[in-house]
Every structure is written in C-alpha cells, then in structure tokens.
Amino acid sequence: MKAKEYLRTIQKLESETKECYGQAEYLKNAINNLSNQNAIETVEELIVDLMDEASDYAIHRVHLINELLNVDDPMQYTLLHYRYCLDYSWHKIAYKLKASVGFVKNLHGEALKSLDRYLEDCCNAEKE
C-alpha cells in the first residue's frame, strides 16, 4: 500500500465512523414514532450493530494513525496528522507550524516519501 492510499484509508474510516453514528442517531429518533414492540426491538438491534461497526472503524483508524508515528521526524507526523486526521487546509497547517505554505507542501512530499519507505519496509518484513 502506498502512502496516499494509506492516508485516504484513514480519512475514509473517519467518514464511515461518522456515517454509522449518524444512522444510529436517526434510528434513535425514529424509535419514538414506532408502536410495534417487535419493530422497536429490531431497530434497537440495528442501532447496536451500527455502534459496533462505528467502534470497529474508529479502532482501525486509531491503529493506522499510530503507525504514522514511524515517519522520519515529528514535524512530518504532525503535518500528516493535521492534513489527514484533522482535515486542515495547507494554510491552517502553515499557520500551526509557523511556516510558509511552500515549506509545508515540501515537507508533505518528504513525509509521503518517509511513509512510503516505512510501509515498504513493513510489507517486506511481512513477506519474510
């Protein structure tokens, strides 16, 4: 898996988690309009399933985020975290890092290379 794909997976897991929570919240509100006990129990089971699914997505996302700590330097990790976990713009990242947008974009390229190397090393280690 390449760095960009890895980082998109982190973003997708966040989206999936939010989607599950949103669906569960919608169903919680819909229960109030139901009178059939069997229907209520079915919806309650769906809510539990959605919350379990959201939890699984969140746990997987945390594991992937923790692996970002293996990039070459803490500033690269911080940049990747801001960009792909917190969805910050380039300008906001530059402001937070007290750097220019150009510097941040260059650092981003280096961080992607570092993450690619780490992911390649992991992949090679698994093959051995």
Feature locations, PLM:
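DNA-recognition helix of helix-turn-helix
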Residues: 97-118
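N-terminal interaction/assembly modules
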Residues: 1-68, 120-128
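Short helix-capping/turn signature of helix-turn-helix
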Residues: 81-88
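Hydrophobic positions on the alpha-helical face of helix-turn-helix-like DNA-binding modules
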Residues: 80, 92-94
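Alpha-helix capping at helix-to-loop junctions
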Residues: 73, 85, 113, 117-120
